[in-house]
């Protein structure tokens, strides 16, 4: 039975009385965001919008993105990645379970030195998928676009991890699962965090 989103008390500056707000809104105010479902247009737009707002509010404060996601749309993942690297606020990414497919791309997109995984996290990279059907010309056109995006994603993984483009391309040919330690050795994350204070 779903319990819904819990409510917590929060007092805005200047207010004497705390208001009950949902947990996510409370954490957004502390600059904590979540990528904890399939990454689709709606979630990507929410994350991008909140990051832009928080950056405009105070560029000197960091933003924290907690990730537990099987991935999702390639274009959405690239959009979130670009927004994270566009804003001036440092973005710390933290894998708290699974960061697979485009979620691992977002994880790798955090500020260098501020990409973390909890000790028992699983990270997975693979090549983007296309699902076109219909006329041959449409299928061919989409296949070419998927290959172009695959090359772009592989290049970014290579830049973010320090791995050669050849190795990234080879590893993306199949689902490449990694433990937190393996992801650190690979360069997808910088630290394995065992407590919040890290």
UniProtKB/Swiss-Prot annotation:
GO terms for cellular component: chloroplast stroma; endopeptidase Clp complex. One of its GO terms (biological process) is protein quality control for misfolded or incompletely synthesized proteins. It catalyses: Hydrolysis of proteins to small peptides in the presence of ATP and magnesium. alpha-casein is the usual test substrate. In the absence of ATP, only oligopeptides shorter than five residues are hydrolyzed (such as succinyl-Leu-Tyr-|-NHMec, and Leu-Tyr-Leu-|-Tyr-Trp, in which cleavage of the -Tyr-|-Leu- and -Tyr-|-Trp bonds also occurs). GO terms for molecular function: ATP-dependent peptidase activity; ATPase binding; serine-type endopeptidase activity. Its main location: plastid. Keywords: Chloroplast, Hydrolase, Plastid, Protease, Serine protease. Its EC number is 3.4.21.92. InterPro entries: ClpP, ClpP/crotonase-like_dom_sf, ClpP/TepA, ClpP_His_AS, ClpP_Ser_AS. The active site is at residues 101, 126. It holds the Pfam family CLP_protease. Belongs to the peptidase S14 family. Component of the chloroplastic Clp protease core complex. This is ATP-dependent Clp protease proteolytic subunit. It comes from Tupiella akineta. The gene is clpP.
